[in-house]
Amino acid sequence: MKSLGIQEIIDGASSMSLQERQREQKEIRQTFANSSESDLVGVEQSVEALAGHLVENDNIQVVSISGMGGIGKTTLARQVFHHDMVQRHFDGFAWVFVSQQFTQKHVWQRIWQELQPQNGDISHMDEHILQGKLFKLLETGRYLVVLDDVWKEEDWDRIKAVFPRKRGWKMLLTSRNEGVGIHADPKSFGFKTRILTPEESWKLCEKIVFHRRDETGTLSEVRVDEDMEAMGKEMVTCCGGLPLAVKVLGGLLATKHTVPEWKRVYDNIGPHLAGRSSLDDNLNSIYRVLSLSYENLPMCLKHCFLYLAHFPEYYEIHVKRLFNYLAAEGIITSSDDGTTIQDKGEDYLEELARRNMITIDKNYMFLRKKHCQMHDMMREVCLSKAKEENFLEIFKVSTATSAINARSLSKSRRLSVHGGNALPSLGQTINKKVRSLLYFAFEDEFCILESTTPCFRSLPLLRVLDLSRVKFEGGKLPSSIGDLIHLRFLSLHRAWISHLPSSLRNLKLLLYLNLGFNGMVHVPNVLKEMQELRYLQLPMSMHDKTKLELSDLVNLESLMNFSTKYASVMDLLHMTKLRELSLFITDGSSDTLSSSLGQLRSLEVLHLYDRQEPRVAYHGGEIVLNCIHLKELELAIHMPRFPDQYLFHPHLSHIYLWCCSMEEDPIPILERLLHLKSVILTFGAFVGRRMVCSKGGFPQLCFLKLEELEELEEWIVEEGRCHFFVL
């Protein structure tokens, strides 16, 4: 096994002001697998070696990175994943977290979805059919598959059936067990990461704590107080050479600006500074450092951090959904100065990220697809603190027939159920303490609730109820849902429902309502009663008899799946706080719609779909030109040409065009939108034969996708054009 070089992490993790950091983070594109963050510097030779073996060595299929938790395996894998040589060599890429709890079908599904994203939902595909399709796909192309955090050799044995013996595919694998890579491929090339030395640990911590940015944005060093330096060098020894722990300690110390403040941190860590002679002692000291980062949070951030304990391991936590949970519980609130729940939530998460307690994974393709995650060691701290403070109770249900012990329900105000079919057992006894109930289904499973279930009546003071992917018997949501008059959050996303009761009108305090469930449904005209709503997602398919009056929903900030077939365009005029809108046009109301959209001065994200038969041509897409603050625009409307660039807001960042049938090349206009970060043209967006990217165009573009443009024959990129990150 070859040992990696020094891991000096995050050049840019200086202790900027919160405002500076927020501005920077809002502009950076981040994803957990798709990330350009420079977490590793000083290991260029190791990254080059790993990339070289993936691309140039035909004798191996697997490159593995091994080492203990928190040492930087995933971070190193990202650097290799994004290496130019790797990106150019392979036809497709998949990144899958495996972890301790997984099923082979889930791993296979994730690989297929990332390699073939255009093939839609495969959650109901038979496992054997999926295996065959994936095997054949990997036989026919050059693909890189990253399996992150494979724990045991047996785990590989469960996954390996989809991988042909010898083809163009390669695998990058990370594991705490160096034997996993050898087991997967006896000829594998293995790297074993090492811990940082005390000197390297202090150098990393010092970068995080003491570097500042000057007015030009350049990093500059700040003179280090001798007493602080002496204490800091001792404290980093408690981090056991793990970059994760060093980063967390650095994030904590960056909030302390005087010697007495440092002394208090030093005294808290002090008992762990001496006498550490075993691995257990080292782990205890590491967890003490991680715990101390939590203990030093202000109360509002503590609650925000603890809320993350609800989610299963490696769960991609959608930040907007998280903000709505927090708002429903009163943990975050909007302010009189115009600060919204989303603004406040982003402030909280970015502060936790600055302290290196979470990572924020911002999808550079879309403004709204933003997630956060925790390292598994930090998650252990989160779970421990949540249990210690009776913040929530987690039920990991291993089988569909498992039940929840009613006695345990009295311990906490919050319940999180991971998998199984245990929800009906909640109705065995009335519990007036529980305020939130979140259900997380695993992969393609569904919990089944009978129409007569008493579980709603048994939890009368619920404020948060997430029943995503729950299957209701007979498709009927029980009318007893209307008894939960204290609800602020209700999600029925991807639930199996065909009938909604009129008792929903009783839920007048709702802030968040997600009706994005499966199947056709009649929605009673009761949503107008929910005048506190901030977020509303309507069903994709509704019965023709559905007619909704929504003009009283004046506090809405997000409205999804609005259709002119079921509600009046004029209702939008009253929703002056809207930031995000997805809208289906089903009639000839384009003029009214255009003027209505022009009144939405806060609108930042617009998704517009034409469902008229026959489709109407919107010449130049004038229908959206009055939206003066747009940052993200998705259009699926017929328009012969794209509007001129000067008609759009200068900070438009993301454009997604499909089924537009544009006859004129849109690139000469798009490339002059100076702040564009992603452009997607697909499914007949352009029906011409030739596209040209000019020299100097797209100065900030990170992502360009051209797909299913059947008439396109020639794509010209003029010499001097800047590098596209992904194509």
Swiss-Prot record:
LRR repeat coordinates: 459-484, 485-507, 509-530, 575-600, 601-626
Keywords: Leucine-rich repeat, Plant defense, Repeat
Name of the protein in question: Putative inactive disease susceptibility protein LOV1
Cellular component aspect of the GO annotation: plasma membrane
Family the UniProt entry places it in: Belongs to the disease resistance NB-LRR family. RPP8/HRT subfamily.
InterPro entries: Apaf_helical (IPR042197), Disease_R_plants (IPR044974), LRR_dom_sf (IPR032675), LRR_R13L4/SHOC2-like (IPR055414), NB-ARC (IPR002182), P-loop_NTPase (IPR027417), WH-like_DNA-bd_sf (IPR036388)
Lineage, uppermost ranks: Eukaryota, Viridiplantae, Streptophyta, Embryophyta, Tracheophyta
Protein species of origin: Arabidopsis thaliana
Induction description: Repressed by silencing mediated by polycomb group (PcG) protein complex containing EMF1 and EMF2.
